Amino acid sequence: MESQQLSQHSHISHGSACASVTSKEVHTNQDPLDVSASKTEECEKASTKANSQQTTTPASSAVPENPHHASPQPASVPPPQNGPYPQQCMMTQNQANPSGWSFYGHPSMIPYTPYQMSPMYFPPGPQSQFPQYPSSVGTPLSTPSPESGNTFTDSSSADSDMTSTKKYVRPPPMLTSPNDFPNWVKTYIKFLQNSNLGGIIPTVNGKPVRQITDDELTFLYNTFQIFAPSQFLPTWVKDILSVDYTDIMKILSKSIEKMQSDTQEANDIVTLANLQYNGSTPADAFETKVTNIIDRLNNNGIHINNKVACQLIMRGLSGEYKFLRYTRHRHLNMTVAELFLDIHAIYEEQQGSRNSKPNYRRNLSDEKNDSRSYTNTTKPKVIARNPQKTNNSKSKTARAHNVSTSNNSPSTDNDSISKSTTEPIQLNNKHDLHLGQELTESTVNHTNHSDDELPGHLLLDSGASRTLIRSAHHIHSASSNPDINVVDAQKRNIPINAIGDLQFHFQDNTKTSIKVLHTPNIAYDLLSLNELAAVDITACFTKNVLERSDGTVLAPIVQYGDFYWVSKRYLLPSNISVPTINNVHTSESTRKYPYPFIHRMLAHANAQTIRYSLKNNTITYFNESDVDWSSAIDYQCPDCLIGKSTKHRHIKGSRLKYQNSYEPFQYLHTDIFGPVHNLPKSAPSYFISFTDETTKFRWVYPLHDRREDSILDVFTTILAFIKNQFQASVLVIQMDRGSEYTNRTLHKFLEKNGITPCYTTTADSRAHGVAERLNRTLLDDCRTQLQCSGLPNHLWFSAIEFSTIVRNSLASPKSKKSASQHAGLAGLDISTLLPFGQPVIVNDHNPNSKIHPRGIPGYALHPSRNSYGYIIYLPSLKKTVDTTNYVILQGKESRLDQFNYDALTFDEDLNRLTASYHSFIASNEIQESNDLNIESDHDFQSDIELHPEQPRNVLSKAVSPTDSTPPSTHTEDSKPISEINLRAPREVDPNISESNILPSKKRSSTPQISNIESTGSGGMHKLNVPLLAPMSQSNTHESSHASKSKDFRHSDSYSNNETNHTNVPISSTGGTNNKTVPQISDQETEKRIIHRSPSIDASPPENNSSHNIVPIKTPTTVSEQNTEESIIADLPLPDPPPEPPTELSDSFKELPPINSRQTNSSLGGIGDSNAYTTINSKKRSLEDNETEIKVSRDTWNTKNMRSLEPPRSKKRIHLIAAAKAVKSIKPIRTTLRYDEAITYNKDIKEKEKYIEAYHKEVNQLLKMNTWDTDKYYDRKEIDPKRVINSMFIFNKKRDGTHKARFVARGDIQHPDTYDTGMQSNTVHHYALMTSLSLALDNNYYITQLDISSAYLYADIKEELYIRPPPHLGMNDKLIRLKKSHYGLKQSGANWYETIKSYLIKQCGMEEVRGWSCVFKNSQVTICLFVDDMILFSKDLNANKKIITTLKKQYDTKIINLGESDNEIQYDILGLEIKYQRGKYMKLGMENSLTEKIPKLNVPLNPKGRKLSAPGQPGLYIDQDELEIDEDEYKEKVHEMQKLIGLASYVGYKFRFDLLYYINTLAQHILFPSRQVLDMTYELIQFMWDTRDKQLIWHKNKPTEPDNKLVAISDASYGNQPYYKSQIGNIFLLNGKVIGGKSTKASLTCTSTTEAEIHAVSEAIPLLNNLSHLVQELNKKPIIKGLLTDSRSTISIIKSTNEEKFRNRFFGTKAMRLRDEVSGNNLYVYYIETKKNIADVMTKPLPIKTFKLLTNKWIH
């Protein structure tokens, strides 16, 4: 606030700094309120004079030194005064500054804040000043002096004078925070004084000087209310006003009382902040003054630590003491005692040089009594000239100790020389020194941090080569020596000021001189024994004397601690003064800032940048000349070396020496590229390249993996090739440090062949530039060739090889020759070269019959390496062949997507002619899985299967190359490749992926599994939309629904688009639970509970026999018993049997896992793969129809193309690998293509109905103005990426109607033609179930609507073209779209935005935050699923009003108005619902299952009996490898996909009791053993036997005042592979089950408690999201509950113990769980295991237990 005021009055550049100090804390920018009238007058006078003499400092100039820190100013220029309220702050006509504002005297001054008391606070610099505080305070305020410009009168004239002065009074500022009240009340009191109301201000005793009048009281009350809003008043002020809202006087009295009590502390802080010392007064007096202030503040609770105190002291040092700011600035642990020792040392040096008399010392008697303790010290520190302190010296090496990098500081010298004895002396304490009476004075200036130093003595150092001394007045003949380099024992530089002579006068009257160096930066004065030996003086440590070689004793040696010392009494003082010796070096080192200090201060910038900044004045306060730059050039900062470490620089042309040193093919570079993902199993995933150093000749070899034997085979091949073809021997191979090169196998091979491996250094890819650049070039060429040709990605290595052949023949600009010429090879004959992807016709030398066509369309790849032929790709046969029997198609563009095969689809004669090929393609190419593996005589690509993604359009994902039949792609499920996640789960072995699961025929020895569920990118994918994140829900239905309308969703398909459950993962489950929860009584549990918040009650009821549930958390406002009964009253918990059943349930739960191996597999499955209700695939397989499968097989067999038929090979399938590879579940294709519905449909009646539907669809498209009918565009004129292929799909709905839909091929849509950020949302299934549950409880009417051709109401922004419908016969023309056509990527998002905008703007709805497609207003709730709308309202007329509004814009059909009071049947998004308003609701799928299950060809009721449970406990899947024929394997996988797809769809709709078994079997889709198939059949059989079961809901009691949302949680510990645990949750709203989830824990839990904690933590986020939805849809209060059968989990939730957990993952979840439970009004209760219905989600259960837990809610 104050900083803003200052900026608004920037024209005032000077003023007094003020501060306000409350009890125990320091505030900024205000002074303590001086309540003394006399003091106020004096301060205002001084302030007026000071302000009249101030001058403005230019902003660009350096900040001047604080005048209070310098020598006294002349009398004519008094220093600035700091009164409590400066003159410019008074409210006069000439000065408009409001009272209470503060200004600083210098731009560099900073306010003193409480943060400066922190030991982590560092002031900006030595010159930064604190505000100047008033020097005194007095009695309470009264009228100011006349000089202030305002004359106050007594009470008799107050009213009359108020009128004349009000016009000059400026009101106080507004109070904006309770923390600002102490400062604000001062300005308010000042406002009253300026308003002639100073007499009514209370004094110290709380009474005003005069009686306040009623008008004054009214004025006081009104102004206080105006300028101090009630919301910003402190609590104690509000308490006073709550008693009497007019008692402003009491507030003022209490405020003044607080201020008065703080004045002494404020004065101490002000004094401490403005300390000044330049040596003019004794150092002891200065020390006493400072220590008294610190002691007084410490006693009052304001703790000034050593660091802050030292900073404040150093700020006030000037003159000779100023350099202590810099030498001491880096000492983090410096104490006040140490700093004063330095000050004493300088002071005594000054006194010794100026007065030539002994140093100033205090009397010994005073020293003993002058003991003070400082803050933050562990024991008392004696601050005295002769401190009485015990010796605690430590052994140290006698080396120079650099104080600039340590905590030691120098002590002063004692120059008194007296006679002493030469007896050997051993001192245990420095105070026991006895060298005669004179020697007692040598114990001076003990340094607090150098307990092992003997003051007044020189330390004898045998390791020092030079003598160093700190005292300047002992040096004779001093001279500057900046070139001397001295280091301490730690190799740190010691700055040297000067060099001179040290003269000794020993007791035999002999004089000796040695060289000495002067520096203040050492801890001891060191006397070098080496230099003494040079003048014939040695130290005898047996007699402890210094003596000459002739035995003459010169001086005694004193042993103190571990060191030996000699007294300074033998040193002769010099005549040079201290200032002179300090200036010998012209202050180049000691008085200048050392460069390392500046380097660190300025963020480790380099010297050049710092010098340039100082020259240009971008850094102020000091200049370039103030820095010692002598060490800048050679200075090496270790922090910079670590933090700015870079790689070494590579010299350009450094490889020339290798080219000159080696012959061709002697030095090779090699590197591996890969892997390339999403490829068929037979396509290579890597390639390895070799480059010769001299000739630059390149080789490339394909690799399927990076195993040692694969790499070794390649090395063997190329070495043999070079040896035989070029008669050369490879000497050196350079490679990186990848494991494929550094393994022992390859190393031994190279060693055996005499080849030297040359490895790059770590993380130095530039050193491997030759191989790296080649790979980059080849990849660039590969991408370009594939883009230009439109060939599928699995031919990527053919493009690599083509590029290698060409580039080996291209000349290098440097050498003017090609690599082939350097190698002595012939050049490339371009007449034999074809463009990559050139269309050709290959002769079929073995046709099926004599009348069969002899030509097969193909695409040229590259010249053959093994013959004179060409490698040609045949898409119709899914193979590459090496042949010379081909003809180039003249005039044909070399792009696959340019071929128009649509005409073939509708020409019956042509179709009949190529019927065998159509069958072949239909069964083998268009289907999802890679069915065929056709061989040829080609070496490495003969077995490449056609990727399900066909040759593509420019950057498209897939397109049929022949299209002789309409593509079978079900674009509703299409997803772009960029959205496909092919990464394995975390716990999956990274070496196992979709691309290497099934080996090719040549790699059959490696157990792998075929990539059955291929997408357009060659792999499987899952949708990354979490179930428990409705706020970010992005259901794929809307985006993929473009391919078909609502009618197809309501067909018999149960794909992803119907269920809205692509985001619901199915995790592996199974096994048994191994919980070992200790038996703890309820009373013991209660004792462990600590009351953490008001919402947790630590005293649960002891008895709860009704449900045996122990309450854990209840609000204090509701009784525990009522809350418990309220939450569990309507839950469908099982009733206990009359007699306790066998302990099977509990004992089963306690059983340990049967198989403890890491790869164990129970019914819970393997891995963390998520199974979904659908897969968004590029193409639809004809295998969905059993008839089509048989026809396709017959066609294949009757063709009898022996040269093309793949051999039937056995596949070895391993359970672990198969389970890890599971990504999703394949849906059943229920739609028909054009040729199936019309062209080849033999059912005449059905054909006619489809034709009728066809024309109806076309008419609707024309009616909706879907495309521009005025103009048709030529295909060649349009950018290919804006052209979208189209197709017709047909379907028969459940009600018997036939539907046709014309859709665009969005699966091959270019990314540039749509906004990838747009989302097409649909209602979440939980939102629908929640809305249905609330409708039942509140007697809502449910109305079902359908909007015809919904997508066509949304305009399209992009420029897109499609092919016209086939009946128009314009296959070479295009039409431009105007509407969001079905199948386009953006259609779903465009429709969502369109309908959302209309509902909000025209219907008055609003979307519920976090729940897309749920709209509401005060009467109606709408759930939107693309073009389906479900309306809920208590008033049917409200629904009708919405319908009327919708019909104005859209063709809206009322499927079911829901007005009947009897039972109404709905078919809502696949759910068959029976609803009788106010009574019940039943949700099932009996009709749908009755129709769909028989079509699965599963033998139903083989033994004529019904199953009672979907699975049996204790049954574990056999883990033996599965050996099966490839065709049989694919059939079984396809069958598993259909069966599990249907089961998953039903389970996530309403059969939550089956989720565990569904998830388990979903993990084994790629492991279709007999056992797995039998379990799947058993699940389908159980679904068939219980197809009439329904999810039953009953209306909630009308008396219930709250909505109750409950989650029941359970976990099965460690029953999954890799010791993962299975967790399950069931969610209930008002006793009705609305959802469930079963999944595997993402973390490996080490105990039952961890597993339960994980389960609970997974349930809470969705519970909170559902709570928000319920509160938005229904305004009744909501109670959230969570039930678990783990007492230990409950204990952790309630505990306040925050000690470290066993591991950080578990600890994080547990701490977060505590916060969520305590912060979300969540009630947690214990539930018995036998009543925990979530148990069915975590493990297989016995029949009796399964029925007991499910018969209450589904029957």
UniProtKB/Swiss-Prot annotation:
Sequence ranges of Low complexity compositional bias: 1-16, 153-165, 402-418, 960-969
Subunit structure: The capsid protein forms a homotrimer, from which the VLPs are assembled. The protease is a homodimer, whose active site consists of two apposed aspartic acid residues.
Region named Disordered: 1-93, 126-173, 352-421, 956-1087, 1092-1111, 1129-1172
Composition skew (Polar residues), residue ranges: 48-60, 127-152, 1005-1015, 1053-1082, 1101-1111
Binding site for Mg(2+) 3: 1610, 1652, 1685
Organism of this sequence: Saccharomyces cerevisiae (strain ATCC 204508 / S288c) (Baker's yeast)
Biased composition (Basic and acidic residues): 1038-1052
Flavoprotein as UniProt keyword: no
GO cellular component: cytoplasm; nucleus
GO MF assignments: aspartic-type endopeptidase activity; ATP binding; DNA binding; DNA-directed DNA polymerase activity; RNA binding; RNA-directed DNA polymerase activity; RNA-DNA hybrid ribonuclease activity; zinc ion binding
Post-translation changes: Initially, virus-like particles (VLPs) are composed of the structural unprocessed proteins Gag and Gag-Pol, and also contain the host initiator methionine tRNA (tRNA(i)-Met) which serves as a primer for minus-strand DNA synthesis, and a dimer of genomic Ty RNA. Processing of the polyproteins occurs within the particle and proceeds by an ordered pathway, called maturation. First, the protease (PR) is released by autocatalytic cleavage of the Gag-Pol polyprotein yielding capsid protein p45 and a Pol-p154 precursor protein.
Pfam family, one: RVT_2
Protein name (database record): Transposon Ty1-LR3 Gag-Pol polyprotein
Domain Reverse transcriptase Ty1/copia-type intervals: 1338-1476
Binding-site list for Mg(2+) 1: 671, 736
UniProt-annotated site: Cleavage, residues: 401-402, 582-583, 1217-1218
Amino-acid positions noted as binding Mg(2+) 2 in the UniProt annotation, renumbered to this chain: 1346, 1427-1428
Location(s) in or outside the cell: Cytoplasm; Nucleus
Chain residue ranges for the region called Integrase-type zinc finger-like: 583-640
Region RNA-binding: start-end pairs: 299-401
Keywords tagged on the record: Aspartyl protease, ATP-binding, Cytoplasm, DNA integration, DNA recombination, DNA-binding, DNA-directed DNA polymerase, Endonuclease, Hydrolase, Magnesium, Metal-binding, Multifunctional enzyme, Nuclease, Nucleotide-binding, Nucleotidyltransferase, Nucleus, Phosphoprotein, Protease, RNA-binding, RNA-directed DNA polymerase, Transferase, Transposable element, Transposition, Viral release from host cell, Virion maturation, Zinc, Zinc-finger
Top-rank taxon, per record: Eukaryota
Enzyme Commission designation: 3.4.23.-, 2.7.7.49, 2.7.7.7, 3.1.26.4
Role description: Capsid protein (CA) is the structural component of the virus-like particle (VLP), forming the shell that encapsulates the retrotransposons dimeric RNA genome. The particles are assembled from trimer-clustered units and there are holes in the capsid shells that allow for the diffusion of macromolecules. CA also has nucleocapsid-like chaperone activity, promoting primer tRNA(i)-Met annealing to the multipartite primer-binding site (PBS), dimerization of Ty1 RNA and initiation of reverse transcription.
